[in-house]
Amino acid sequence: MFRKKKKKRPEISAPQNFQHRVHTSFDPKEGKFVGLPPQWQNILDTLRRPKPVVDPSRITRVQLQPMKTVVRGSTMPMDGYISGLLNDIQKLSVISSNTLRGRSPTSRRRAQSLGLLGDEHWATDPDMYLQSPQSERTDPHGLYLSCNGGTPAGHKQMPWPEPQSPRVLPNGLAAKAQSLGPAEFQGASQRCLQLGACLQSSPPGASPPTGTNRRGMKAAKHGSEEARPQSCLVGSATGRPGGEGSPSPKTRESSLKRRLFRSMFLSTAATAPPSSSKPGPPPQSKPNSSFRPPQKDNPPSLVAKAQSLPSDQPVGTFSPLTTSDTSSPQKSLRTAPATGQLPGRSSPAGSPRTWHAQISTSNLYLPQDPTVAKGALAGEDTGVVTHEQFKAALRMVVDQGDPRLLLDSYVKIGEGSTGIVCLAREKHSGRQVAVKMMDLRKQQRRELLFNEVVIMRDYQHFNVVEMYKSYLVGEELWVLMEFLQGGALTDIVSQVRLNEEQIATVCEAVLQALAYLHAQGVIHRDIKSDSILLTLDGRVKLSDFGFCAQISKDVPKRKSLVGTPYWMAPEVISRSLYATEVDIWSLGIMVIEMVDGEPPYFSDSPVQAMKRLRDSPPPKLKNSHKVSPVLRDFLERMLVRDPQERATAQELLDHPFLLQTGLPECLVPLIQLYRKQTSTC
């Protein structure tokens, strides 16, 4: 009577109006699934492709720019801080946009970044895999060093003394330094004589030591222009390998001048008004339309002379403030060993350019007592741009608003090295757009996110993917681009073979885009079939600008290890100075990809392939007997080891092979064939 009544089971009806639209099966011959939904198929395809790499330990350094002083800290409020930092951000170029990191990352962060490179081999020093007898180079002291940082040839291995940790100048000194001319320096020299004790004191904002960092010790021992300093270690004069004798009177005089100049920095910072730390607008660099700037000798400057001085810091060996991916004329010791100026550009002694070069290369780090430095270990990242500061800088570049209010029907269609790509629909127009979503916290180098916005916004071309808008959504950067339904060229070359008319059509479109970008001083640095997208009517467009760089007359070369291993040019792998010629080499590898179905050495590991590309003769076609002599000549003009002998994009547009170029419609059958092969069974 009092028993609990059982609940009546709900009745669940069968599916209504059910339609079997997707049928997935496994093809044992091909060893893959067929009939997968498009978003699943795209994810599987992209996971199999090699990812681009950025070696954080090999980042090109640049000279000091005014805005970087503010990045290292300011006494102004946050709003004024960001406004002063980016008052001219709308005209920001990639040269300056890549410089928002305050200083070199710590060893822990470098190790984490290396673990993100997409291959287990990159967890260790890449140099140990790329060592070869030809890879020896000299340090500023004339010692030959191998790529893996071994013992200098011709010298006994000597114990490396405990290095002294650096300290960073107070805020506003760089801006103050730029306003100082030769006359002011001479007038302040007497005042600086009374401040010698400042060289031994430690300011509150001391930079953290990394004396226990083995990788940092290795970088300090290297002294190579290609390697970004692994730490900010500064050794004493007696700690250099080779044990030089006592300095000459002229050397001591130059060293004293440099120390007096540093002392003046400390004294002027204590009395400088707050307004002196606010930088002016960042210098605007005009794009460089010349591929190879002329080289000529210049009279040696003070910076070049300082290379051989036994001072407390080897000038030009360490980057004072930035880890940006731009090359500095002061670091180009091979092309201009006796000058501290840009090759082919002379500046009179004492000119603002010369003084700026001296300041940026030698006068920003001071030695510090190791016992004091150990106490600053807790505040290790005080000089690094915070996440909120970086977001504020990025917010000044992107469009305002929330794209989630404008878009709907998100479908993930791909995944890359920097983020995911979704297909979405605009609510007001119904147009389909591709949305690239990149998490700011998961980037190998977050500064490169500016490239996604700045390059595609400023350089529009018929053969370049159009960017509609960019937004900052929470912790992600969203870039809205046109959606090309034909897919990537990779999908086609991996399934079918292209005839020479189709190869010429693709090459002509890519060369048109590269000729335009190179004339503007833009290096793509990741040319491959994955970066070439197609429309349904056969038009070819270049995409993926996340790893590009910009050169100019002031920054004519780059030297960072950036790109996808199998498509990298030899000069990129060997960390030599390079310019737009690296894109031509990568295009040549892509031509091999269109003929053979895959790039050379694709069965090797990425590191092994890079070693072969660096040390071996240019790769050849597997099916060279199937191509015409004019195509072979076209390919040989691109795959030349010497960048100076390699053809430019404009020269290749005049090559006879491109006379076979057809209309975009000639690529439509390839797109349709691929879509048919991947359609539902």
Swiss-Prot record:
Interacts tightly with GTP-bound but not GDP-bound CDC42/p21 and RAC1. Interacts with the androgen receptor AR. Interacts with IQGAP1 and PPM1B. Serine/threonine protein kinase that plays a role in the regulation of gene transcription. The kinase activity is induced by various effectors including AR or MAP2K6/MAPKK6. Phosphorylates the DNA-binding domain of androgen receptor/AR and thereby inhibits AR-mediated transcription. Also inhibits ESR1-mediated transcription. May play a role in cytoskeleton regulation by interacting with IQGAP1. May protect cells from apoptosis through phosphorylation of BAD. Its main location: cytoplasm. Residues 308-333 have a biased composition (Polar residues). PANTHER family: NON-SPECIFIC SERINE_THREONINE PROTEIN KINASE (PTHR45832:SF3), SERINE/THREONINE-PROTEIN KINASE SAMKA-RELATED-RELATED (PTHR45832). It catalyses: L-seryl-[protein] + ATP = O-phospho-L-seryl-[protein] + ADP + H(+); L-threonyl-[protein] + ATP = O-phospho-L-threonyl-[protein] + ADP + H(+). One of its GO terms (cellular component) is cytoplasm. GO terms for molecular function: ATP binding; protein serine kinase activity; protein serine/threonine kinase activity. Belongs to the protein kinase superfamily. STE Ser/Thr protein kinase family. STE20 subfamily. It comes from Pongo abelii. Autophosphorylated. Phosphorylated by MAP2K6/MAPKK6, leading to PAK6 activation. Residues 12-25 form the CRIB domain. Residues 1-30, 200-256, 268-355 are annotated as: Disordered. Its EC number is 2.7.11.1. It comes from the Eukaryota. This is Serine/threonine-protein kinase PAK 6. Residues 407-658 form the Protein kinase domain. One of its GO terms (biological process) is neuron projection arborization.
